[in-house]
Amino acid sequence: VTESAIDNLTTSEIAAAFGADLILLNLFDTLNPKVSGLEVDKPENTVKKLQKLTGRPIGVNLEPVDEKAEMESTKLQISSGRTASVKSMKAAEKLGFNFVCFTGNPGTGVTNRMIAKAVKTAKKNFSGLIIAGKMHGAGVDEPVASEESVKEFLDAGADVILVPAVGTVPGFTSEELIKIVKIVHKHGGLVMSTIGTSQESSGAQTVHDIALQNKIYGVDIQHIGDAGWGVVPPTDTI
């Protein structure tokens, strides 16, 4: 949302044109809605206009920041419209988002404990699909994904569990992913593996191999991140 591809052309439209089934907006401020390259008559029509142009469901990242998190890196401060709160969730509902994703960008101090809390809050304030989990540590000293945290997200009401794709985060193994997939599927949920640690800017073969391997491990949805030019993945990797 921070960079347009060219004048009056959003990166969301490019992603949709090259095969993206779902569009997830990162760094989007729900209290100050705007997308670079998108012209709207009123800010409150931003999401609806993007849905019309792309023909895709549109979601938003909201970050459940933990003020008490034990950080491994310098903590970054983000706007209130990007954090997971009752106010931002109600704003996302009003804007017309189809789904929310509770996760953390690098250095934001998002913890699994706060993700579970955000899911519970969202069940009362947002009517769309709820995705929950971490793509990487988000600067916090805790396991990125574990069976315990996954169970907490499911019990809180998450529809889709987000995990790092095997091959994107050091130490997260196929054995761990397979166990998580079985837990989620038994609960009736879906699993989304993510390429969110810059591998999306690698060659197409690298992305192909990661996606194929994680599909073999049982995931249902493959995410690809925003580390390419103009904060959209190179089109050949989509």
Kindly give the residue locations of the regions a language model identified.
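Anion (oxyanion) recognition and catalysis
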Residues: 16, 51-52, 123, 185, ...
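Short low-complexity, flexible loop/linker segments enriched in glycine and/or proline
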Residues: 38-40, 115-117, 146-147, 176-178, ...
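Short, composition-biased local secondary-structure segments
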Residues: 58-63, 119-124, 150-154, 171-187
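Active-site-adjacent loop and "lid" segments of alpha/beta metabolic enzymes
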Residues: 9, 70-82, 140-147, 190-215, ...
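Generic hydrophobic/aromatic pocket-lining and core-packing "Φ" positions
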Residues: 12, 89, 119, 150-151, ...
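C-terminal helical cap(s) of enzyme catalytic domains, especially alpha/beta-barrels
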Residues: 34-48, 180, 216, 227-238
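Catalytic-face loop-and-helix region of soluble metabolic enzyme cores
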Residues: 160, 164-231
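Active-site beta->alpha loop and helix N-cap motifs at the rims of alpha/beta catalytic domains
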Residues: 2-116, 129-147, 154-155, 159-167
